């Protein structure tokens, strides 16, 4: 497929989702064009057969067309331009369609709630990856070249320069999350950013670091700005809801002047009195749960084995707040490499299918087109083009991923926990330089590479033995 998404393909997709009048929204994540639809019954599921489309996921009110990284963004931009030129559906007809779809939407409320995380965090993922790669490369060079923290010279300065982006990102991350979360929940982004900043400020007048808020208690009550991302998400949701209620009663002439003012005062009061303590408890509970799962080999196997299923249902973005909580509590994201084993198991399954397929079969062609992205951590082409349509290989791929997760869990249990140096990043082989541990970057890279190898081999063996029987290998 060409670098640019062809207008013919996009027009065909637009026709098969019911035309421009059936489109409620248009956006994208890292690999998928996401089209919100008014009436899902008008969508033709055979979109997945179009050349250049790597898969399709249908929900009650959304069509997700898998293009792959980079292409999804270009597809969304081009589709938005097409929709801008298209005639708009009558408002009464849209309202009628929305009413017909209400019941179906209610049945998938949990999935839609988790999909909010994609809206909040997907715009941040390129920054996570870039900052994490720079930090990983700098750490690897410093380890190999024996550059100490207090070293002087051109090389240490260059390494510190490469590390500064990660420090900047994670220092002010809550403000970015607050902005995106407030928008995702239907509010004004800047209000969410301001409320999030309250979690970043310091409330200890004797502290020598941080940004002092100017007061150390809230009308005599102690302030405990814990919870970080968890608290910020709750506060941003509350901010958006309060803004909506205030706006309903605010005269139009005073809306710009008073709506945000009242919203901030009410939300900040709730944040200091309720949300900060609540967020802290939830943060500690979530960190405790996943830290214990990560240190339990069987728990790691279960997490890695089920992650492909989470990707299929589109709820894998719900793990991102957990990643951020682990970064705060451990200093690295120990869950991400475990879940990455799911993609490695799928690579092994695809290689087994390639080995068992006929020399000139369509299956071999499909595997050749999807295996390189799979090795580099982009799993959707393999999921929707190779393993999931044949089901048994999908199950054996999950088992291969579970074996890789079990390996990483065993190593952590024996005393070498490791993880990603960022809240989010690429998986597959690209993630190798992003691994870190208390023992250094090289042991962490070795553990991750070992896990990938175990998942590849296990996925290959499971699929060869159990995943090719009564399966279409043409």
UniProtKB/Swiss-Prot annotation:
Topological domains, Periplasmic: 145-157, 202-217, 282-301, 356-368, 415-440
Catalytic activity: N-acetyl-beta-D-muramate(out) + N(pros)-phospho-L-histidyl-[protein] = N-acetyl-beta-D-muramate 6-phosphate(in) + L-histidyl-[protein]
CDD domains (alphabetical): PTS_IIB_glc
Subcellular location: Cell inner membrane
Any single biological process term in GO: phosphoenolpyruvate-dependent sugar phosphotransferase system
Top-level taxon in the UniProt lineage: Bacteria
GO cellular component, one term: plasma membrane
Keywords on record: Cell inner membrane, Cell membrane, Kinase, Membrane, Phosphotransferase system, Sugar transport, Transferase, Transmembrane, Transmembrane helix, Transport
Topological domain spans for side Cytoplasmic: 1-123, 179-180, 239-260, 323-334, 390-393, 462-474
Residue ranges crossing the lipid bilayer per the database entry: 124-144, 158-178, 181-201, 218-238, 261-281, 302-322, 335-355, 369-389, 394-414, 441-461
Domain PTS EIIB type-1: 1-89
Active-site residue numbers: 29 (phosphocysteine intermediate)
Membrane topology: Multi-pass membrane protein
Stretches assigned to the PTS EIIC type-1 domain: 115-474
Keyword Cell membrane: yes
EC number(s) from the headed UniProt entry: 2.7.1.192
Main location as per UniProt: membrane
Family annotation (SUPFAM superfamilies): Glucose permease domain IIB
UniProt keyword Protease present: no
Record remark: domains: The EIIB domain is phosphorylated by phospho-EIIA on a cysteinyl or histidyl residue, depending on the transported sugar. Then, it transfers the phosphoryl group to the sugar substrate concomitantly with the sugar uptake processed by the EIIC domain.
Function per UniProt: The phosphoenolpyruvate-dependent sugar phosphotransferase system (sugar PTS), a major carbohydrate active transport system, catalyzes the phosphorylation of incoming sugar substrates concomitantly with their translocation across the cell membrane. This system is involved in N-acetylmuramic acid (MurNAc) transport, yielding cytoplasmic MurNAc-6-P. Is also able to take up anhydro-N-acetylmuramic acid (anhMurNAc), but cannot phosphorylate the carbon 6, probably because of the 1,6-anhydro ring.
Protein name: PTS system N-acetylmuramic acid-specific EIIBC component
Species: Escherichia coli (strain UTI89 / UPEC)
């Amino acid at each position: 497929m060409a670098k640019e998404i062809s207008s013919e393909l996009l027009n065909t997709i637009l026709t098969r989702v019911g035309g421009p009048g059936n489109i409620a929204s248009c956006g994208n994540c890292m690999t998928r064009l996401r089209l919100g639809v008014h009436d899902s019954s008008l969508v033709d599921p055979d979109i997945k057969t179009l050349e250049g489309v790597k898969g399709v996921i249908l929900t009650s009110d959304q069509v997700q067309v898998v293009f792959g990284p980079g292409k999804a963004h270009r597809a969304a931009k081009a589709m938005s331009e097409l929709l801008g030129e298209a005639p708009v559906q009558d408002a009464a007809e849209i309202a009628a369609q929305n009413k017909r779809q209400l019941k179906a939407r209610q049945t998938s409320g949990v999935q839609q709630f988790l999909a909010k995380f994609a809206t909040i965090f997907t715009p941040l993922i390129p920054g996570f990856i870039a900052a994490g790669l720079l930090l990983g490369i700098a750490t690897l060079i410093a380890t190999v070249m024996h550059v100490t923290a207090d070293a002087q010279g051109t090389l240490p300065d260059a390494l510190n320069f490469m590390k500064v982006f990660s420090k900047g990102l994670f220092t002010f991350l809550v403000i970015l999350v607050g902005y995106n979360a407030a928008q995702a929940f239907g509010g004004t982004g800047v209000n969410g950013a301001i409320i999030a900043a309250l979690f970043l400020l310091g409330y200890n007048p004797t502290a020598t670091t941080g940004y002092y808020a100017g007061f150390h208690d809230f009308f005599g009550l102690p302030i405990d700005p814990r919870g970080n991302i968890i608290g910020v998400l709750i506060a941003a949701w509350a901010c958006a809801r309060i803004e909506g209620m205030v706006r309903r009663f605010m005269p139009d002439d005073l809306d710009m002047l008073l709506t945000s003012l009242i919203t901030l005062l009410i939300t900040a009061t709730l944040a200091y009195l309720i949300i900060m303590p609540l967020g802290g408890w939830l943060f500690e509970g979530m960190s405790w749960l996943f830290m214990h799962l990560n240190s339990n080999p069987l728990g790691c196997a279960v997490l890695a084995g089920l992650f492909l299923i989470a990707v299929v249902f589109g709820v894998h973005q719900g793990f991102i707040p957990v990643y951020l909580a682990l970064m705060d509590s451990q200093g690295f994201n120990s869950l991400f490499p475990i879940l990455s084993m799911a993609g490695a198991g799928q690579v092994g399954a695809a290689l087994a299918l390639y080995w068992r397929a006929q020399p000139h079969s369509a299956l071999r062609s499909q595997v050749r087109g999807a295996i390189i992205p799979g090795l580099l951590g982009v799993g959707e082409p393999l999921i929707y083009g190779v393993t999931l349509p044949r089901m048994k290989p999908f199950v054996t791929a999950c088992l291969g991923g579970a074996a890789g997760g079990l390996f990483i869990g065993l190593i952590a249990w024996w005393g070498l926990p490791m993880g990603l140096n960022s809240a989010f990043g690429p998986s597959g082989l690209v993630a190798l330089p992003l691994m870190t541990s208390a023992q250094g970057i090289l042991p962490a890279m070795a553990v991750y590479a070992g896990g990938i190898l175990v998942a590849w081999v296990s996925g290959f063996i499971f699929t060869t033995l159990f995943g090719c029987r009564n399966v279409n290998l043409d």
